[in-house]
A protein has these predicted regions:
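N-terminal flexible/basic segments that precede or flank functional cores
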Residues: 1-22, 26, 30-31, 73-77, ...
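DNA major-groove recognition helix of helix-turn-helix/homeodomain DNA-binding modules
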Residues: 62-78
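Residue-level detection of the helix-turn-helix DNA-binding "recognition helix"
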Residues: 29, 43, 54-56, 83
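Residue-level signal for the short linker/turn that defines the boundary of a DNA-recognition helix
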Residues: 22, 32-33, 59-62
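Hydrophobic transmembrane-helix microenvironments that flank and shape a buried ionizable site
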Residues: 19, 50, 57-60
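Alpha-helical residues within the helix-turn-helix
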Residues: 29, 40, 69
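Short alpha-helical DNA-recognition segment
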Residues: 32-52
């Protein structure tokens, strides 16, 4: 399936995926949270945060919303920035 003439690949290393990771890292840091602190808020291991922040794994939309609420971060603003790259 294509969007705006671009193929949507499954690569976790796409520009949009990297942008999402970078925006999530920036939001966490702006909130003054460590990976460990955010993980505790989500009842997840620190490795969960590390893996999506490094692009080792993707997060689904439900996880994304939960993470944004835990930070807290504006999920709509983050998605709007990522959408420009898709």
């Amino acid at each position: 399936m294509a969007s705006r003439g671009r193929k949507l690949g499954k690569s976790v290393h796409s520009a949009a995926q990297r942008a999402l990771c970078d925006l999530m890292i920036a939001a966490r840091k702006r909130a003054g949270l460590t990976q460990q602190a955010l993980a505790a808020r989500l009842s997840k291991p620190q490795s969960f945060i590390a893996k999506y922040e490094t692009g080792e794994r993707r997060i689904d939309v439900v996880e994304f919303i939960a993470i944004c609420r835990a930070i807290p971060a504006d999920s709509a603003a983050i998605l709007a920035k990522v959408a420009k790259l898709v």
